[in-house]
């Protein structure tokens, strides 16, 4: 599911009551996510298992995991997903609620249309929060544009260049599922994401 957002408010212009409401929804989602965790072994939980199987089908950086696994692992360890920015908190809320990976990129920072595909390797990429480049691997599945990679290993690691910031005005938000049986969950998650963005951003 894809949600394209235009005319986003700068974070500083979002009323404090809305910031607090979003934070409360994320807190609730951290609790709700526990229903997706039927095993203390992270890889044995159905949402994680489905993505682990998908990740075996393409070349990945060692240790790369789907973003929803990283979020659910925090919940499993009793370390709730923290508040970051209103926009990121919204998509993390939806991600935790439905146990589906949700990502977001700044459209204005993209060099061209975004595309998902197998790369020949060497695509420029600076991981979010890192000081050194980490180019893509040959045979890796990634999101990219004409300037390089946007998200490594499908939905594992976002890049600095197109990351959403407090000043972002246009956003590309995406929710993904590899389980056909969860089509209704994907549709519901997309609807909730669109509704929250429209209400708060």
Name each region found by the language model:
Residues 1-201:
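Charge-biased, low-complexity intrinsically disordered regions
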């Amino acid at each position: 599911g894809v949600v394209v957002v235009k005319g986003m408010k700068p974070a500083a212009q979002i009323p404090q009551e809305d910031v607090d409401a979003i934070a409360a929804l994320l807190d609730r989602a951290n609790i709700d996510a526990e229903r997706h965790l039927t095993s203390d072994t992270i890889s044995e939980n159905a949402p994680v298992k489905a993505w682990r199987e998908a990740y075996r089908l393409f070349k990945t950086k060692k240790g790369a995991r789907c973003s929803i696994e990283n979020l659910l692992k925090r919940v499993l360890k009793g370390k709730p997903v923290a508040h970051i920015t209103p926009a990121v908190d919204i998509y993390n809320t939806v991600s935790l609620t439905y146990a589906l990976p949700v990502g977001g990129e700044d459209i204005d920072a993209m060099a061209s249309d975004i595309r998902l595909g197998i790369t020949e390797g060497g695509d420029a990429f600076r991981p979010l929060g890192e000081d050194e480049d980490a180019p893509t691997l040959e045979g890796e599945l990634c999101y990219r544009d004409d300037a390089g990679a946007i998200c490594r290993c499908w939905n594992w690691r976002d890049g600095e260049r197109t990351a959403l910031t407090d000043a972002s005005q246009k956003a590309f938000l995406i929710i993904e599922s590899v389980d056909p049986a969860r089509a209704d969950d994907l549709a519901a998650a997309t609807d909730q994401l669109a509704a929250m963005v429209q209400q708060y951003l």
